[in-house]
């Protein structure tokens, strides 16, 4: 059965000198260890994350796709590459360079690899322009972070960007980033285990409860990473609150469940019980295979959770593994 992995990451061979042209202290770069098989994403001289060669080497990436039986993978930026903290004009060269490098990465095997672009989301005009440029140059969509500092996705600037993408038929993947990392989150990778799912829940509910979906075109193709974070499990809580509290429903004419048809989620939930809940909540027609490859917290055997899920008929399994992504990206 065909497999299309719509959520994977890359990081280009950015040297420290190139990153320093944007910001020596906070712009990320790649240090490759002796031997070339492993390395670290660096911030100045501080190691941010250990990584291995598939993140930057498309040849190894394709070898791994072959091993996992994946026909096509859509790669996007590692979120630390976004550059939202900088002035939009100052970061524009960086963003376009990253997007061009993503296309170079995919050019190794264009029938196996596609790219989603990043945009300078902090500047609406530049973000819209880069999204359109990226589509014209071969990207199949854009990936954005789930917030801009104190601005959630219901902020009018971000809604306007989503409206542009809907009108221009540019698919959007929303990925959590810049989550709470201090205080009680410092140990055991808690930011990735707790804060990331909470960020995605916050983003989805911000769009729903603000009424933003009422202002967005139905042509917008929107997907949330990591199975929608905590949202599927807590949908009942939000639904109950909408019915019971007027302050919850003040800006949303319909309960949260009404909007499930307006977005997709990926399948990166790692447990058959979680996937069963996800299918029951969203429907198989709203879930796409996503692995988070090649990071350690990604699905280690890409697509096997869906392929082996009890209770899925062949039609539903095909939709999740490939069919929905074909429609989402217009492939």
Roles of regions detected by a PLM:
Residues 11-15, 73-75, 81-85, 124-126, ...:
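Short catalytic/ligand-binding loop motif for oxyanion handling, primarily in non-cytosolic enzymes
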Residues 121, 176-180, 293-295:
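Short glycine-enriched loops at secondary-structure junctions
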Residues 131-288:
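Catalytic pocket-lining loop regions of alpha/beta-barrel enzymes
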Residues 88-95, 103-164:
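Long, hydrophobic, well-ordered secondary-structure blocks that form the structural core
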Residues 78-94, 125, 187-193:
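Surface-exposed, active-site-proximal loop segments in enzymatic domains
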Residues 42-53, 62-86, 112-120, 140-144:
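Divalent metal-dependent hydrolysis catalytic cores, especially in the metallo-beta-lactamase
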Residues 9-53, 179-198, 241-260:
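Active-site gating loops and adjacent loop-to-helix segments of metal-dependent hydrolytic enzymes
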Residues 1-6, 13-72, 100-108, 129-133, ...:
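Mid-to-C-terminal alpha-helical segments outside catalytic/metal-binding sites
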């Amino acid at each position: 059965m065909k497999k299309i992995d719509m959520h994977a990451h890359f990081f280009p061979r950015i040297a420290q000198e190139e990153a320093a042209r944007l910001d020596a202290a906070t712009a990320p770069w790649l240090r490759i260890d002796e031997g070339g098989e492993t390395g670290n994403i660096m911030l100045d001289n501080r190691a941010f994350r250990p990584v291995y060669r598939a993140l930057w080497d498309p040849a190894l990436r394709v070898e791994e796709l072959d091993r996992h039986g994946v026909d096509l993978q859509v790669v996007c930026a590692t979120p630390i590459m976004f550059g939202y903290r900088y002035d939009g004009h100052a970061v524009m060269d960086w963003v376009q360079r990253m997007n061009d490098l993503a296309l170079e990465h995919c050019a190794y095997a264009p029938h196996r690899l596609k790219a989603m672009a990043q945009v300078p989301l902090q500047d609406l005009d530049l973000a819209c322009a880069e999204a359109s440029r990226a589509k014209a140059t071969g990207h199949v969509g854009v990936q954005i972070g789930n917030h801009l500092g104190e601005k959630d996705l219901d902020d009018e600037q971000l809604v306007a960007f989503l409206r542009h993408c809907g009108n221009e038929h540019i698919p959007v993947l929303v990925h959590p980033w810049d989550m709470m990392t201090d205080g009680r989150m410092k140990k055991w990778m808690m930011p990735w285990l707790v804060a990331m799912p909470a960020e995605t829940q916050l983003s989805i509910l911000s769009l729903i409860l603000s009424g933003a979906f009422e202002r967005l075109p139905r042509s917008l193709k929107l997907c949330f990473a990591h199975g929608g974070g905590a949202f599927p499990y807590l949908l009942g809580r939000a639904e109950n609150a909408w019915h019971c509290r007027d302050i919850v429903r003040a800006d949303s004419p319909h309960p949260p469940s009404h909007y499930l048809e307006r977005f997709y989620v990926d399948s990166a939930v790692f447990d058959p019980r979680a996937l069963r809940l996800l299918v029951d909540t969203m429907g198989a027609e709203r879930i796409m295979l996503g692995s988070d490859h090649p990071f350690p917290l990604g699905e280690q055997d890409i697509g096997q959770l869906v392929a082996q899920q009890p209770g899925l008929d062949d039609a539903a399994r095909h939709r999740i593994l490939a069919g929905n992504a074909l429609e989402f990206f217009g492939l």
